[in-house]
Amino acid sequence: MFGRAPKKSDSTRYYEILGVPKDASPEDLKKAYKKAAIKNHPDKGGDPEKFKELAHAYEVLSDPEKREIYDQYGEDALKEGMGGGGGMHDPFDIFQSFFGGSPFGGVGSSRGRRQRRGEDVVHPLKVSLEDLFTGTTKKLSLSRNVICSKCTGKGSKSGASMKCSGCQGTGMKVSIRHLGPSMIQQMQHPCNECKGTGETINDKDRCPQCKGEKVVQEKKVLEVVVEKGMQHGQKITFPGEADEAPDTVTGDIVFVLQQKEHPKFKRKGEDLFYEHTLSLTEALCGFRFVLTHLDGRQLLIKSNLGEVVKPDQFKAIEDEGMPIYQRPFMKGKMYIHFTVEFPDSLNPDQVKSLEAILPPKPSMSLTYMELDECEETTLHNVNIEEEMKRKQTQAQQEAYDEDDEPAGGQRVQCAQQ
């Protein structure tokens, strides 16, 4: 309600904007708006403010109630709330109500574009073998681009943009490089003026929140659930959590599990392999030791009475391997690989004691005369890996020295007669 009657006005500005007389019919208004809107559309290089004014003028004059109030009392009456208020719709929505999208064949248009799919963002996630055995949850803080809430991804205050003059709205530029006589190379690259968007925004019209970038940075914490039995290289996907962009279906954030090496355990599928070294006494007379499992449980490992463990032998324990993924109550096997450590030397008394206990040595079939004819040799200790490396290095050095040697002496020449 007004405290006093509004003043009469003979405002004709909205009619002038559309270029029609005050007695124009609804059909005349439609034709005038369509013609002027296409001409001034930002995607065709038109003035964003002019485009906005055209939409507002048509919105008022096409509504019989608002038009009557405007004709009698002018713009101020609409702003003060007569005729349902002075708020206006998005100028692009009004334009789209006529054409159902872009009348320009989609070239450079910021609306009616076919959406492309954004790229997935892939992160490696380091986990221990213990994590994969027991399962764990990791909280990770990430930064990503999201559509600006102030301009809803348009980049401008008015919602308008202009076709980039540098690339003619294609978002790409072609450069030619001369490689030589009659040879050129043609290369296509994103336009540096519009950053490949095909659009530019007037500096004065840029959104104050995103500065015309259409997106802003957002920090987000994701809870990554690593389930029991997951494998090295397995992917955990968060659909639609990657960087947002206008006219783009948001990609996924993907975490790829990277298992760290374990000092004692090795994993092969659903089985675990454990390395353990026995002394010679343990291998011959029996052993007993405690194995700490990946979940902290203590397992007592012992040999059977009278059992002899040979070097490089394997023993298996059922249901102590890795949990099977998505079937956590089922597990593989644990294999224990035994290495036997021998003493460096024995004194004569120890040798006699062992000979009395152990099976007899094989007897030699050679006679004393045949033994006298044999040549004696001397054995010495060697680290075979270091020995092979030394020989390889020596061979490489000799080859290098040969390459550095100067050409041989003067060639033999035939004496001239």
From Swiss-Prot:
Residues 415-417 form a propeptide. GO terms for biological process: protein folding; response to heat. Its main location: membrane. Induction: By heat shock, and in response to NaCl stress. It is found in: Membrane. One of its GO terms (cellular component) is membrane. One of its GO terms (molecular function) is Hsp70 protein binding. A lipid is attached at C414 (S-farnesyl cysteine). The keyword Acetylation does not apply. The modification Cysteine methyl ester is found at C414. Residues 11-76 form the J domain. InterPro entries: DnaJ, DnaJ_C, DnaJ_domain, DnaJ_domain_CS, DNJA1/2-like, HSP40/DnaJ_pept-bd, HSP_DnaJ_Cys-rich_dom, HSP_DnaJ_Cys-rich_dom_sf. Residues 384-417 are annotated as: Disordered. Plays a continuous role in plant development probably in the structural organization of compartments. This is DnaJ protein homolog ANJ1.
